[in-house]
């Protein structure tokens, strides 16, 4: 007697729109209710943002012209979000929550992108485990809406890892280098080391598959994108933030 073999059930896959909504709820709650955990966030980022938008604020030695170890680019990007919100609701509280909600939304978009790549490249069950962790993890809850360069680097690292996993249409080496480079240039420089294991794998696969030429081209393409980002960041700091600070200081 012949028995008809049934195919195994497909793994459960949460649609991307539901995933985005779940991440938005979690990160939105963090933006509205999570306390600020680090004094560095207050004095090195919220105070300079207040300075750019309102003309006064406290200054740490790290932003002092004597030392200048921090770039104003990261702060100015978020100050622009707060300034745009002030045109809708003229309130400093509204600016504060607009920036935090913007951070939460950005994190949710990056989480959804990485979840999608994990489900397609690995397995939907692994993607579901990842989603469960990022939604209910206390660390991710606080980091998702934190106004810190390491948070920005976390966003770009998720996008870089998503590009590394997503091999549809071929490897996205240049895109991966660009995302990690953006995180290192604008966010936290030491995070650039995160790309080293990924590049090692790309090098091994490239030489084993006897396609070193395309790999070298992709690496040079990614390096050129990072160079363009670095030049753009310097020009933005020189021609936008620089004159603003000069007028504010009264030089």
Model-predicted segments: where are they?
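Transmembrane-lumen/periplasm boundary regions of multi-pass, lipid-linked membrane glycan transferases
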Residues: 150, 180-251
């Amino acid at each position: 007697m012949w028995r008809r073999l049934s195919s195994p059930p497909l793994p459960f896959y949460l649609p991307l729109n539901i995933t985005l909504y779940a991440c938005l709820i979690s990160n939105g709650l963090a933006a509205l209710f999570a306390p600020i955990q680090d004094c560095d966030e207050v004095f090195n980022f919220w105070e300079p943002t207040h300075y750019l938008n309102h003309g006064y604020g406290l200054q740490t030695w790290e932003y002092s012209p004597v030392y200048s170890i921090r770039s104003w680019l990261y702060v100015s990007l978020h100050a622009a979000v707060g300034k745009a919100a002030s045109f809708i609701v003229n309130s400093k509280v509204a600016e504060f929550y607009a920036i935090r909600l913007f951070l939460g939304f950005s994190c949710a978009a990056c989480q959804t992108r990485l979840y999608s790549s994990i489900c397609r490249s690995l397995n939907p069950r692994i993607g579901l485990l990842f989603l469960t962790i990022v939604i209910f993890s206390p660390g991710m809850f606080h980091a998702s809406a934190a106004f810190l360069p390491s948070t920005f680097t976390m966003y770009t690292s998720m996008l870089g890892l998503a590009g590394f996993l997503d091999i549809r249409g071929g490897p996205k080496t240049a895109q991966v280098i660009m995302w990690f480079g953006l995180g290192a240039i604008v966010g936290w420089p030491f995070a650039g080391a995160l790309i080293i294991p990924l590049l090692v794998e790309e090098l091994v696969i490239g030489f084993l598959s006897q396609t070193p030429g395309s790999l070298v081209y992709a690496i040079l393409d990614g390096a050129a994108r990072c160079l363009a980002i670095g030049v753009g960041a310097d020009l933005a700091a020189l021609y936008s933030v620089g004159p603003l600070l000069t007028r504010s200081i009264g030089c």
